[in-house]
Amino acid sequence: MIELWPAIDLIGSTSVRLTEGKYDSEEKMSRSAEESIAYYSQFECVNRIHIVDLIGAKAQHAREFDYIKSLRRLTTKDIEVGGGIRTKSQIMDYFAAGINYCIVGTKGIQDTDWLKEMAHTFPGRIYFSVDAYGEDIKVNGWEEDTELNLFSFVKQLSDIPLGGIIYTHIAKDGKMSGPNFELTGQLVKATTIPVIASGGIRHQQDIQRLASLNVHAAIIGKAAHQASFWEGLK
């Protein structure tokens, strides 16, 4: 069964969503982060909660550590955190604060040796986040090009004990227009590492289709704030 990971994106300790990762598209969510955690925690089908420090991702260092630490105390669900994680000490601080998993993106792309070291140091607890327009990988809060190809890069990671690869199709993110099923399916076939789909998920039918592609988990953003998404789920 595909896992469900609702998302909380933070700017200034406020729960927001962006469209296509553009910071000028910031939209405040109807529920606070605290309210969202309480809401998601009632569902047995929620395996973990995905939290992103958006300003940290852009500024290249974590900004919301203390606030995220306070959120950790509000639920028994697993929590993973990403955004601005660039050092081993940051990862260790999050783990010491009770965070279960850390997400590495830009730093892992720019320094694959470091990514390998972190994955071997914390096997199964480091997730690699790859964000792309089509097959073109972006970094630093999705604002910079890398000239790297999604599939070529991911194939380099096959022997690393990562928890998974979080794939965000940027053009779909925040639009509620459905995931990029074609590229997501191709990515699943290109690696033995579990693939987590993010971006564009609208409803349970999207989840079912991702499950048919052998996607390990789905990160749900805007849709998770709609009661209709959760109808019939426990």
UniProtKB/Swiss-Prot annotation:
Its EC number is 5.3.1.16. It catalyses: 1-(5-phospho-beta-D-ribosyl)-5-[(5-phospho-beta-D-ribosylamino)methylideneamino]imidazole-4-carboxamide = 5-[(5-phospho-1-deoxy-D-ribulos-1-ylimino)methylamino]-1-(5-phospho-beta-D-ribosyl)imidazole-4-carboxamide. It is found in: Cytoplasm. GO terms for biological process: L-histidine biosynthetic process; L-tryptophan biosynthetic process. Keywords: Amino-acid biosynthesis, Cytoplasm, Histidine biosynthesis, Isomerase. Pfam families: His_biosynth. Gene3D superfamilies: Aldolase class I (3.20.20.70). The keyword Thylakoid does not apply. Pathway: Amino-acid biosynthesis; L-histidine biosynthesis; L-histidine from 5-phospho-alpha-D-ribose 1-diphosphate: step 4/9. It comes from the Bacteria. The active site is at 9 (proton acceptor), 131 (proton donor). One of its GO terms (cellular component) is cytoplasm. One of its GO terms (molecular function) is 1-(5-phosphoribosyl)-5-[(5-phosphoribosylamino)methylideneamino]imidazole-4-carboxamide isomerase activity. Its main location: cytoplasm. Belongs to the HisA/HisF family. HAMAP family: HisA (MF_01014). This is 1-(5-phosphoribosyl)-5-[(5-phosphoribosylamino)methylideneamino] imidazole-4-carboxamide isomerase. It comes from Staphylococcus aureus (strain bovine RF122 / ET3-1). The lineage of its organism: Bacteria, Bacillati, Bacillota, Bacilli, Bacillales. The gene is hisA.
